[in-house]
């Protein structure tokens, strides 16, 4: 049987700071829900069938999918217990749709992670025989992001260190984790039950899956996206406004490069 790949999109977040009636993943960037941006990128990359993990206001997300993307499947996360727990809710989907292949995990509020970055990461994932390959970005100002620590300048990943836990030397690293990953299916299914919640929030984090695989001697890699905006998401209205501004500027820039005259005022 040929290898199959599949996609799991995390869209269970409450988005409390948005103070909107819609689930965060359905909030628009240039009149299109962020979730649609993510689904479109995964499909354009040829990443197989998609499962959207829902949670807060799941009925709204499920109704939107039924109308706009009925091919997507859903898995329900009844409690928001972290990204690792969310992926675990999609375990049956992963077993059924990534037989012998790889699983792409994406955040439902990251509209600028494009198909090219997804395809490039999969090529590196398969070429290097990685158990997991995270999609990273190199930022001028990496403040607030988890740093990607490598064994050598372009070597395998040895750790992901969150900002609050990083040493001064680690804080100087400009390569950051986008929160998007390709996992080998068998490794992901094996490691998900081993993720613990011994942390201040009592949650199960998908980044711990990467650390557990590394400790087991599996190879972890990272593939930097050419567009550093790939790491951007929206946790509040100001960040959502920034995403819309960036998307608008990209459209205007493309038009002007094509010869369209757009007045400055």
Kindly label every feature range from the protein language model.
Residues 1-20:
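N-terminal nucleotide-binding beta1-loop-alpha1 segment
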Residues 2, 201-265:
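Left-handed beta-helix
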Residues 11, 54, 107, 136-137:
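Short beta-strand/turn micro-motifs composed of small residues
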Residues 21-38:
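Short catalytic helix/loop segments, enriched in acidic residues and glycine
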Residues 113-200, 207:
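Conserved core of the sugar-phosphate nucleotidyltransferase
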